[in-house]
Amino acid sequence: QSETKLKDERFDYNVIPYSWNNTWGGGREDMVYKLANAGFKTVMSNSSAFYFDMANDNDMDAFGLNWSGYVDYFDTWAIDPQDIFANRALNRKHNITSDYILKTTKLNPNKQDNLIGIQSQLWTETVTSETILDQMLLPNLIVFAERAWAKKPYWISYQSSAQEHKMTKDWNQFLN
């Protein structure tokens, strides 16, 4: 787990940090919450959900990198920016245990306004043509827009099999 501590006297609170380095299981998934809880207006730009230049699987012909794991559309669509560990399907997919989650920092409900948004990015060091750009940008952008602007679905932090079924149904409907 990350042992990062924030010391108030070192920071200018007029800075808006963008928290991005949060590979699943790497111990930094909660950095955005640590910053928000410390009083920073901050933006979540998670590499494990919102980087469009990550490969979506280990296919040798897939475009993108894998330093932050494999990121598919479901990772972007199913994440809850206010509680990234809320969705049990994502936790299972990335082998995140309840013991691991207990050791992480949660977003303080009184500091939720400090999480001012989410941002996606597409780094272009692996984009060598317009076709590759289109393949990496457009499907991801549609999925990201759904998460960024749509009303938070009730199942996002599901605790029952009925809610998981509803999530799966909504996911299939979104895809089709």
Over which residues does each language-model region extend?
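Substrate-binding groove of N-acetylhexosamine-processing glycoside hydrolases
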Residues: 1-176
